[in-house]
Amino acid sequence: MEARAAGYFLVLIDRKEIRMGFGIFGVSADIGIDLGTASILVYIKGKGVVLKEPSVVAFDRNTNEIKAIGEEARLMIGRTPGNIVAVRPLRQGVISDYTITEKMIRYFIQKAVGKRTFRKPRICVCVPSQITEVERKAVEDATYNAGAREVSLIEEPVAAAIGAGIDIAKPCGNMVVDIGGGTTDVAVISLGGTVVSESLKLAGDDFDEAIVRYMRKKHNLLIGERTAEEIKIKIGTCYKRADELTIDVRGRNLVTGLPRIITLTSDETLEALREPANQIVESVHNVLEKTPPELSADISDRGIVLTGGGALLHGLEQLIEEKTGISTMTAEDPMTCVAVGTGRYIEFLNNPTAEE
């Protein structure tokens, strides 16, 4: 499972006949999307996760023709001819390339619901907390242009809390740390809303970049982001492991220019990942300092919950607990928390009188 991979596209389709809206215009679906920097995840009610692909698009820079989207495009990163470029149209949780993002959203909506004609769906999109109004408008416009009938937005930490099984409607403080691919959102939630939050433009992708820098500096070895991600998943840690792990790393020797293989240890990844991990801990500390006393007491009792693909980095749970003195736990399935939370939220929007 991808250790970032943090941020995701989550598509939730309500299969209830009453919502399907069969008619002369085809099938209508209610869809929830987590606009993630690193991956796309598709969740269908009653079926669970049915699609998981990277949020990568490959296109011809001469003609602007899209060549591949998702996993196929990811495999092209670093291996394309000069005229073909594989890019991530989302950076740090927001749209960096509007046109490509719009086409990518449209592609995954169609892939999720099938090729058949369907009425324009209502779509709920997850966005990082504290993004600007301009960035929010860009998300809304791209989603409308991708085929939405109505668009609503929900902050990622709120969706993550719902998906983690936290009852956010109660007057009780809950802290969620959602670590995606491009952003880390730290939030205290009570009575269905965010009380205090901080959005850090550092997450799973930055773990990969830290490993790339370390390999270049310490071993004079140039590696790609896919290799760095593999290192992170297999032996990466931000807390001392009981048993040291190793991995053979292939790259290009910066001195000779020739291919080279070295053996990397988990202790070395601890050194490589120390700075980005400490920045996340510092963000948690900042939010705790701004939290009202009564809610701080709740968090002390209930603990901190980690969600998102970045929460899978070994040792992060222990590091936060050691630095804050507060019990810290990772959600049961951190990578799908936002998917489930988005689905429950859009169900609530369509049926606000439901008990849930």
Pin down the residues of each PLM region.
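Nucleotide/phosphate-binding catalytic cleft detector across ATP-hydrolyzing
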Residues: 2-179, 187-305, 311-356
